[in-house]
Amino acid sequence: MKKQDISVKTVVAIGIGAAVFVILGRFVVIPTGFPNTNIETSYAFLALISAIFGPFAGLMTGLVGHAIKDFTTYGSAWWSWVICSGIIGCLYGWIGLKLNLSSGRFSRKSMIYFNIGQIIANIICWALIAPTLDILIYNEPANKVYTQGVISAVLNIISVGIIGTILLKAYASSQIKKGSLRKK
């Protein structure tokens, strides 16, 4: 079995991705009125980075980006949700492996596959794992954190479903389609 190294391109993608995640997470959110629960544009961007660079880049971008966002916003990280940002980034990357965006194609079938995958991933991460970790790590009240989790899952599904799909389509459209160049 050959050891796979992490490329410089992936490391740079993680760094830039985490920085953009922080900026979007701090300054491009829409409050919902429910405590600590916002419409987050950062997860749509995380889906793009993860789909392009893979599960490891998604994992690290989510972990590092969310941790820095929390430290710069609140002074400390809320680790249960930081962990889930890493998990969701990894899952977006895993979904993205089948999309093959670099081919220049993001068909209706690919959009449906991506959105079914992200819906399942968001429900698992935000409605199940994050609240459970909140209870185990921080001894938070179950009714509060599961309500936050379900609201976050729904909002992230909508955000990633709309903004993420647009970003993936735009990225795929910017790629040169295989066989589209012809020699005269």
Curated annotation (Swiss-Prot):
Keyword Transmembrane assigned: yes
Annotated keywords: Cell membrane, Membrane, Transmembrane, Transmembrane helix
GO cellular component, one term: plasma membrane
Organism superkingdom: Bacteria
InterPro entries: ECF_substrate-spec-like (IPR009825), UPF0397 (IPR022914)
Localization per Swiss-Prot or TrEMBL: Cell membrane
Pfam family, one: ECF-ribofla_trS
Membrane association type: Multi-pass membrane protein
Main location: membrane
Entry's transmembrane regions: 11-31, 44-64, 77-97, 111-131, 148-168
Record-stated family: Belongs to the UPF0397 family.
Protein name listed in UniProt: UPF0397 protein SAB2561c
Organism of origin: Staphylococcus aureus (strain bovine RF122 / ET3-1)
